Amino acid sequence: MRVLLGFYRGSYHKFLISAFFYLIKHSPTLFSPLLIAGVINGVLEGGDAARHAILLNTGIWLGLLSIHLPANYLHSMYRSRVIRSTEAGLREAMVRKLQELSIPYHTQIQSGRLQSKIIRDVEAIETLSTQMFVNLLNIVMNLTIMITITAVKNRIILVFFVLVAPVASLTVVAFRRRISRVNRAFRLEMEETSARVMEMVEMIPVTRAHALEEVEKERMSRQLQETAEKGYRLDMVQSNFGAAGWVVFQCFQALCLGFSGFMAFRGLILVGDITFYQTSFTTVVNQFTALINLLPIMTKGLESVTSVGEVLSSDDVEENEGKTELAELRGAFSFRHLAYRYPGSEKRVLEDFCLDVRPGQTIAVVGESGAGKSTLMSLLVGFMMPESGQILIDGQDISTINLKTYRRFLSVVPQTPLLFTGSLRDNITYGMDHVSEEKLEEALEAANLKKLVDQLPQGADTLLEEHGANLSGGQRQRIAIARALIRDPKVILLDEATSALDVVSELEIQKALERLVKDRTTFIVAHRLSTIRNADWIVVMEKGKIAEAGTYEDLLARKGIFYHMESLQMSLR
């Protein structure tokens, strides 16, 4: 609850203003039992007193009703502005946090779960806030006014009102833990379902290609049935909880009616007061019933607060504050006895990796899958820190450098190109403002995209489908290459960037890269060994270690691992 209130810090005064207008808005309902009792007692008294009581109480009621609409408008305006702005602010805070969290954090949690937290859980928090502000405020206000008036009129009947509180508390205690447990199970199951649905959608081409539609339907059906079962358990617990509270409170109301009727029969209270006390007790019972019915919503909302808090409170963030900011980068790298193992694994994927790289050199890294090539690239970008050893950049340890300033000098082309829905121009100039047409043309030409752009209906402004689905694999890869090249980086990282290109495009890209890597430090991870003939230095990795290193010709002359890899590829061409 403290976390939830923290979300609204700075807006408490607006809530108080809204609460004030809420009180005015509901004043006709709050005072109606008293006004009705006044009319009944006046009529029973007869004469001028009856006329006066009818006119006075009716006039007061109509006067209170006349201010309902303006009070409702002001109450809703203040409440909605606070809740909606906080809802948007909470999602923005989660987006900012996700951008700060480390890459290992994102690899360990499914994107569907994060999507569920940002959309579904924040929506549940908004519902909780609305329910608490409207219903809880209404409950507190009604209870306070009814109990206060009853205490002034008759303290004996007040005993019935007061006894409702401990009975409600016992009912809540009896069900609270179970509701909380079932709510948590349902929330986790919904996150899993969200992740499975996203995974299913992304896998549709693979599923269709292997005629596995029925298998996937069955898999999703089991998941959805499990979610439905968890939801059923939650519904039953909530239903039983509400029914138990209702029965107990109705018993109390029947006793209150009998007791107030007995007191009127004995002449201790007026007949009209029976209506007042019964209406007041009905209001009190209804408020406690509403409070009990509100508990499942509050439990669900507070579980969502916990879920969102898991992200916002995570300390698995990339720390850059106070570290050295790079104003320039020459591109000299030194890897000193580098070692790394992934969390939860006993095996090192990199061990005793040593290499010195001069500015402007092109370094190629080759090896079988699992040799540690991609891990090395992730360490080089700063996605992870080495378990032991050092990476020196222009003589400075990477752990002491502000990585945001370092990455401004990098361009990375991943093995799988990542494109978003938008124009081709937007995808290439992602994150850059005011890119000239000349610079864009140069990047398109260098990445062998000029011919493609000329054929598109709107040229560079042609919209791409989701993930660039309306392009070939090679075209998507070339867009990723153009995105890297347009930044005019000091360091280029190519993670098997030409693996999706046809032979003709590969040759053209190779010529472009030879021009563009000049005076830039370049790291290339490659499977096609023919693409790294002109590399200044080739590192052959095996089981996380450097097995051999040298120029293309030197390695072939040694007839070692590299020679056998190249011979095998030559035989397959």
Q: Would you name each region that the model predicts?
A:
Residues R9, I103-P104, R120-S129, F133, ...:
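An intracellular "coupling" helix at the cytosolic face of ABC transporter transmembrane type-1 domains
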Residues G10, K14-I24, W61-L64, V134-A185, ...:
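Transmembrane helices of ABC transporter permease
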Residues L98, M220, V308, F335-H337:
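Conserved catalytic Walker-motif region of ABC-type ATPase nucleotide-binding domains
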Residues A327-R573:
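ABC-type nucleotide-binding domain
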Residues F20-F21, P28-A37, N41, L64-S111, ...:
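Juxtamembrane helix-loop junctions of ABC transporter transmembrane domains
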Residues F15-A71, A151-I156, G267-V271:
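Transmembrane helix-loop-helix hairpins at lipid-water interfaces of multipass membrane proteins
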Residues G47-A50, I149-L163, V237-T306, V311-L312:
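Helix-loop-helix
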Residues M1-Y12, L114:
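A short amphipathic helical element positioned immediately N-terminal to and/or at the very start
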